[in-house]
Amino acid sequence: MTTLDDALATFATRRPVLVALDFDGTLAPLQDDPQTSRILPDGVTALARLAATDGVSLALVSGRSMNDLHTLAEVPAGTFLIGSHGAERARVTTFGLDRDVVQLSDEQADRLASLGAQALRIARGRDGVWVETKPTAVVVHTRLAEDEVARPAEDEAIALGEQLGSGVLHGKDVVEISVLRASKGEALVALRDELGASVVLYAGDDVTDEHAFEALGPDDVTVKVGDGPTAARYRVGSPQELVAALVALADPH
């Protein structure tokens, strides 16, 4: 059985390739306050080197809104950003973001407003539970809540999503209810095909990253960060371990 080091050594010889990575819990250690999340310093350097390498395309694939992802992620111009679990896409330029436009129908916009109002009712009176509104989704966050508060809030959010949403994603301390059907896997495959990448490296830590692992092929390099069952072929224990692997990939000599 090949090791991750072996797989990355082979990956480094292929062209063109796509290096696609989750943000929270993968490049950036998880934080109680999500606005304090940052890519590890060695990761910032490695991503810049990879992006400057001929035949290498770079992408971040995150559940965060595009605005959050662009604000927090220190990535070079040319990097593709896929936000909201595939519902938003943009490319970083020297002047900001070149965005793909997300257009909701009147019905979807009304449903999003209703979801937001009902999600706020779920959070009301529950310490540590808060609601984020994205362009295509509503997210109930429970990271700061005690377990006995978080569980019923998540259960109610899931039930709300099953009633009114087009898709429900239950990740680490979050329930996201979208009015558009999208997944990291679909978005990643679309980007790979658009770029004509011969092989993809994808790493992620959450259950939502399993969609990407499952969508990729046997020649692609899929890496689970942390514990838990996974469809990924390889595993590392922490963002620090993943960044070390990226440093080696970016500077194989």
Annotate each predicted stretch with a short phrase.
Residues 136-142, 174-178:
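A generic structural motif
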Residues 38-131:
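Active-site phosphate-binding/coordination module
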Residues 1, 14, 185-253:
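Mg2+-dependent phosphoryl-transfer enzymes with acidic/Ser/Thr/Gly-rich catalytic loops
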Residues 115-119, 152-161:
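Short amphipathic alpha-helices in soluble, non-transmembrane regions
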Residues 145-149:
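Helix N-cap motif at beta-to-alpha junctions
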Residues 1-23, 27-31, 42, 74, ...:
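Non-catalytic pre-domain segments flanking phosphatase-related domains
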Residues 84, 90-110, 169-197:
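Substrate-recognition "cap/lid" segment bordering the active-site pocket of phosphatases
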Residues 129-134, 167-170:
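Short beta-strand
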